[in-house]
Amino acid sequence: MKTKTLRTEKVNVITLGCSKNKVDSENLITQLKGNDFDVSHETKQKSDIIIINTCGFIDLAKEESIQTILDYAERKKEGEIKKLFVTGCLSQRYKDDLEVEIPEVDAFFGTLEMPALLSRLNADFKHELVGERWISTPSHFAYLKIAEGCNRTCSFCAIPLMRGAHVSRNIEEILVEAKSLARRGVKELMLISQELTYYGLDTYKKRMLPDLLSQLAKIEGIEWIRLHYAYPSKFPLEIFDVMAAEPKICNYLDMPLQHAQNEVLTRMRRQITVEETKELLQTARQIVPNITLRSTFLVGFPGETENEFQELCDFIEEASLDRVGVFTYSHEESTRAHDMEDDIPNELKMERANRIMEIQSAISFEKNKSKIGKTLKVLFDKIENGHYVGRTEGDSPEVDNEVLVPLKGNYARIGDFADVFITDASEYDLIGVINKIN
């Protein structure tokens, strides 16, 4: 048997930003490995070539991306690395400016320019590797991107400027990738795109997410399928029917609502009212009684009055969502909202974000306390600080609650499902003991 000879230059890929960027980096690494590169992901070891996959979503993300580029540009000047390439959303949006400001970078590439990046490295884009993605997550779960881009025109959002229009992947291609992941031990798939519920409208002329879910649920080895980034306007209610009928589809929905005051929603161009939102949440809970609802909200949008913000607070208390995240408004150039005055001081934006999280913390604590004395199915992700750390069906990695099980007196392996008896709870964690490994 022949031994593969790797290229002598070592490549390190750095990923910043969201799970969609993570998938892009994983696909890039797959192509580099297929071209015989010795490639690592975010290694501390010495590397010859650095590729930074950037985020340009909001100011904080842009600052992190720029600082990371500058750090590696300095290391290149000092001779620690030979080549520095930048790709991703920041590069897509500000390529011309970045080329002038950071000349140490050998080349900048946009979000859809992987073939050009590979060509710069004297490598080929290998179509046969599509669907055979290397994953950077623990081996038992993976993100599965079903579409790219977004057709929405939310006034605050720059994503369409960086990711382009919505393009759905072919169902057969998605299934091939999902089956490949399952063969390699993946048990949980997290479906992602900029707008999950739009899937299929461009290529199949109808919303195809329910059909895709039904087919993914047939794949042997996959036990959990989780839905991220659904858009509330014109939500296809058939998704709830599939969720209720198919045990593999997690009773979990991540649906960013952004706000809950009608005038603000209009200024945001969200194409939905508070009344319609409440009706959608009620329908979800009627069809899937034990559904976990996650959402994110945006505070400090231009013109947001104290009364408008209070209506948002009242909604969050009334809706009693299971998981909530908050962003403060970032005044993004070239968006429709950029023409409005960014009139909310940063201190007030942060104060409002903190007030939302105080409300949600109390809601989360009450919901978690109600789980004490119950036995829940848990998937273990890691060992940390003397505990197995896992998640329930109602929790996604990194952003949601965790279940902590002491190492002493319990035994499990990473990637195991187990029945865990809950003995205690805090605002964002559950504590328990293992009853049975599944």
Where is each model-derived feature located?
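Terminal RNA-binding accessory module
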Residues: 339-438
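Conserved SAM/AdoMet-binding glycine-rich loop
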Residues: 82-88, 93, 98, 183-307, ...
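Conserved, mostly hydrophobic/aromatic
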Residues: 154, 174, 191, 227, ...
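Glycine-centered loop/turn positions within well-structured domains
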Residues: 115, 152, 197, 262-263, ...
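Radical SAM enzyme [4Fe-4S]-AdoMet core and its adjacent flexible, acidic
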Residues: 18, 200-221, 268, 331-362
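Proteins enriched for Cys/Gly/acidic motifs involved in redox and nucleic-acid/cofactor modification
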Residues: 1-199, 238, 249, 253, ...
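Short, hinge-like loop/turn segments at secondary-structure boundaries
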Residues: 102-103, 124-126, 207-209, 243-245, ...
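Active-site proximal loops enriched in glycine and acidic residues that flank catalytic Cys/His/Asp
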Residues: 193, 229, 257-259, 295-299, ...
